Amino acid sequence: MTLNLPDTIKFVITDFDGIVTDNCVYIDSKGEMTRKLNFKDVMAFSILRKNGYHIGIVSGEKNSAIEIIAKKFKVEEVHQDIRVKIDVIKSIIERYKLKKDEFVYIGDDINDLETLKFAKYAITVPDAVNQVKAIDGIQITTAHGGNGAFREVVDCLVK
């Protein structure tokens, strides 16, 4: 599916696991959890910054990959270990005085449902849970989470 986003978008807000990562957690011999990132998706953060977009990451989990990405690319809004994402999204919208056609939300799981239904522009990945893919009007990337999906959204915005 070809994504369709307007020129009015100023803020890209995304979940992390399942969108920027492949939704897998790797556990090393010391019991530390790590995640794999695709460089296409990492580069997408740089492209957004260079083109004047605001960026937000709202994740249900806390992990060091988010902190590294946020610091490197000066992500304005970073919220980890969030159970009720809609409250955070509404707070961001209020703080930045955004209209509903000025932000896009990208998510893939049940903890994103309420936010995806609230967003005028909602995007998910092919491997999202069925409840997310069934949302009326949701757009689905061609690329899977952690394999260029975030970059696909960014490439749609930055032509």
Predicted regions and their residues:
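Alpha-helical substrate-recognition element adjacent to the catalytic core
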Residues: 1-84
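Mg2+-dependent phosphoryl-transfer enzymes with acidic/Ser/Thr/Gly-rich catalytic loops
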Residues: 34-35, 86-159
